[in-house]
Regions:
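Short, structured segments at the rim of ligand-binding sites
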Residues: 1-358
Length: 358
């Protein structure tokens, strides 16, 4: 099937963004550990959150999380501290994604977890029990979802949790997001040094909570604004016509183009909000309003973009494609986690961009 996609004459829109998946999935775990009756409002409708909601509803004995990596990690820890014996599995790709680091850490705390298939990979058989351990060490360069999974169950452990992180700590904003949400639900949890987090025992409080809009989803609208100046260039067979031909006809529209993204905040919990600052270097101006953010084009894009993406790995694909479309050379580092996502995102990027001869 083939589609023809045409740019609008001018770019003006007010967009209601989807709710944050990262916040939704954490809020659901915290809500369940609080034995809450008040379901968080404005939950994401993405597959990951739907899978998480179903898994937490009714305590099934067999849980298929499909391709939802976040659900696999968070639920592995959650099931370790809640009553019952459950098998958790996923797609064939999910069964190729390693989980040994998290399982070993949970076992060190006293969890009862068995591998049903290949050692170190899902599926898992988990029997919930009271975890007697309270202190563990973990490499700081592992997936932040492992760290978040452990932190969220920390306050329901009899002695709480003291988590030491060794080496470089990647995706620190996602760890901070987890800690902030835990505090919103009544837990005492914080950094006590640059590499150590403590979580006090005591459990969670059932708390009314509304999920904010998703900064990751916002990145695609930032991308549209960034490439507004080249929208009349034709991309066909990988050959793009000169930007000069469309410069005059698009100059006025580019100047007045405006997108309003509803439900975003300046002081967001989400680490991906940093994307707004990076897009400034690509000519996108962000103005915060009482409804969200307003995007316009302003200034001259950078001639080269060098960025450490270790704290915003989920935005890497957006920036790679944006830079390719804008003919801006770039060098991005800190992308080691992209190879173990639902697919190898680096390989996927290279494969798809080659189709455009990028």
């Amino acid at each position: 099937m083939r589609y023809t996609v045409s740019a609008p004459a001018s770019l003006h829109a007010a967009i209601q963004l989807p709710a944050s998946k990262s916040i939704s999935n954490r809020a659901l775990i915290l809500h369940s550990l609080a034995h809450g009756n008040i379901l968080p409002r404005n939950l994401s409708d993405c597959d990951d959150t739907i899978v998480m909601t179903r898994a937490l509803d009714g305590n099934p004995g067999h849980i298929d999380i499909l391709a939802a990596g976040t659900a696999m990690r968070f639920l592995t820890a959650y099931l370790s501290v809640t009553p019952g014996t459950r098998i958790i599995t996923g797609t064939q790709r999910m069964q190729q994604r390693p989980i040994r680091i998290l399982v070993d850490a949970l076992r060190e705390l006293g969890a009862r977890i068995e591998y049903v298939g290949n050692e170190g990979f899902p599926p898992l058989r988990i029997t919930g029990t009271e975890l007697t351990g309270s202190e563990i060490s973990l490499a700081g360069n592992v997936s932040s979802q492992y760290i978040s999974a452990l932190l969220m169950i920390g306050t329901v452990l009899p002695k709480g949790l003291r988590l030491h992180l060794t080496g470089d700590i990647i995706s620190r904003p996602y760890i901070n997001l987890t800690l902030q949400l835990m505090r919103d639900f009544g837990a005492q949890a914080d950094w006590v040094s640059e590499d150590c987090i403590t979580v006090s025992p005591g459990g969670y409080t059932d708390t009314p909570f509304t999920v904010e809009s998703d900064w990751s989803a916002a990145s695609y609208w930032y991308q549209m604004m960034a490439i507004e100046g080249i929208k009349n260039e034709k991309i066909k067979g990988g050959d793009r016509s000169s930007a000069k031909e469309s410069e005059d006809s698009t100059k006025e529209e580019a100047h007045t183009a405006e997108i309003e993204l509803l439900g975003l905040f300046a002081h967001s919990y989400q680490g991906d909000s940093r994307g707004a600052e990076v897009f400034t270097r690509l000519g996108v101006h962000t103005e915060y309003t009482d409804r969200g953010v307003k995007l316009t084009r302003k200034g001259t894009p950078a001639t080269r973009l060098d960025e450490d993406m270790v704290d915003i790995p989920d935005l890497a694909q957006t920036f790679v494609v944006t830079c390719c479309l804008m003919d801006i050379p770039f060098r991005f580092t800190g992308l080691q986690s992209l190879k173990i996502k639902e697919t190898d995102r680096i390989t996927a990027l290279i494969t798809e961009l080659r189709k455009l001869r990028s």
